């Protein structure tokens, strides 16, 4: 999907609510430094100072809309950033522009970091000739999930289930609580009715076969070493060819190619949201009639 079109997935009211909550977290009361800057009309340039994938424009826009500033973009969503890149310009009252600065930069750095990691993972997987889905997980930052899931999509990965309601996923603890794989899948099928798929986390071929026999749509082979993963997936597919197979647990950008194989449909990586390095952005004010520069001016 074109990254520019992904903004349509984000409800405007949700964007505004998130932006408002982030700004209130940073400034819940008085803003003393506003008396230093004043309210004169000002402009600043957003610079990208590290390579990666640009992601998070709708959230950036929403943050500055909350503080009465306007953003003009020079690069589209999903752009490959080559530092130092001039990404956007922000205009508005000085105290408002600086009120939104750090919140907007934090969000953009994090979202772009996730997108960059996702893009690297997808490129790595495709380089092996594998055509399955590279996915994130539900291992996201509380209160920041929408940003991170959106970043995955911009990077070309799939977001996996957005929340508990997107898929009935039976994990190891659910199996213990239900009294076994078959009982857990039966309960999951009742909960899923016709609208949701059921996925079961399995730690052995025996569990995987039991889950598929009980009616699971997908089987998650968790924490399998590659040399165990592929024979297990092949044996499962031989008996249940329509069951989807997901590999997860211990997958990194370095060892990802080892998990790609003809019987694996999905590979999910928690590190895409948990360990992706943030990109480096800065927002620099400049005086009317001067040339914007990406670093602090020297006197």
From Swiss-Prot:
Gene3D superfamilies: Aldolase class I (3.20.20.70), Quinolinate phosphoribosyl transferase, N-terminal domain (3.90.1170.20). It is an enzyme of class 2 (transferase). Quinolinate binds at residues 102, 138-139, 160-161, 171, 201, 222, 248-250, 270. Residues 8-12 are annotated as: Important for hexamer formation. Pathway: Cofactor biosynthesis; NAD(+) biosynthesis; nicotinate D-ribonucleotide from quinolinate: step 1/1. Keywords: Glycosyltransferase, Nucleotide-binding, Pyridine nucleotide biosynthesis, Transferase. Involved in the catabolism of quinolinic acid (QA). This is Nicotinate-nucleotide pyrophosphorylase [carboxylating]. It comes from Sus scrofa (Pig).
């Amino acid at each position: 999907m074109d990254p520019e079109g992904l903004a349509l997935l984000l409800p405007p009211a949700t964007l505004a609510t998130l932006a408002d909550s982030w700004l209130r977290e940073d400034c819940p009361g008085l803003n003393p430094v506003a008396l230093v800057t004043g309210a004169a009309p000002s402009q600043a340039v957003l610079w990208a100072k590290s390579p990666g994938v640009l992601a998070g424009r709708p959230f950036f826009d929403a943050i500055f809309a909350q503080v009465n500033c306007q953003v003009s973009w020079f690069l589209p969503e999903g752009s490959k950033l080559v530092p130092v890149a001039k990404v956007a310009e922000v205009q508005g009252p000085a105290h408002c522009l600086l009120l939104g600065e750090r919140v907007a930069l934090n969000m953009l750095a994090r979202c772009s970091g996730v997108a960059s990691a996702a893009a690297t993972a997808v490129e790595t997987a495709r380089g092996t000739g594998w055509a399955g889905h590279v996915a994130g997980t539900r291992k996201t930052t509380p209160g920041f999930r929408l940003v991170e899931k959106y970043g995955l999509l911009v990077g070309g990965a799939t977001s996996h289930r957005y929340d508990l309601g997107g898929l009935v996923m039976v994990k190891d603890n659910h199996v213990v609580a239900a009294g076994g794989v078959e009982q857990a899948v039966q309960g999951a099928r009742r909960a899923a009715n016709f609208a949701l798929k059921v996925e079961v986390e399995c730690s052995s071929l025996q569990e995987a076969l039991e889950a598929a026999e009980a009616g699971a749509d997908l089987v998650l082979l968790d924490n399998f070493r590659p040399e165990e993963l592929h024979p297990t997936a092949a044996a499962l597919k031989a008996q249940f060819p329509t069951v989807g197979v997901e590999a997860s647990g211990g997958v990194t950008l370095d060892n990802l190619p080892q998990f790609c194989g003809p019987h694996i449909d999905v590979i999910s990586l928690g590190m895409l949201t948990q360990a992706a390095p943030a990109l480096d952005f800065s927002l620099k004010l400049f005086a009317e009639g001067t040339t914007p520069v990406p670093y602090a001016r020297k006197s």
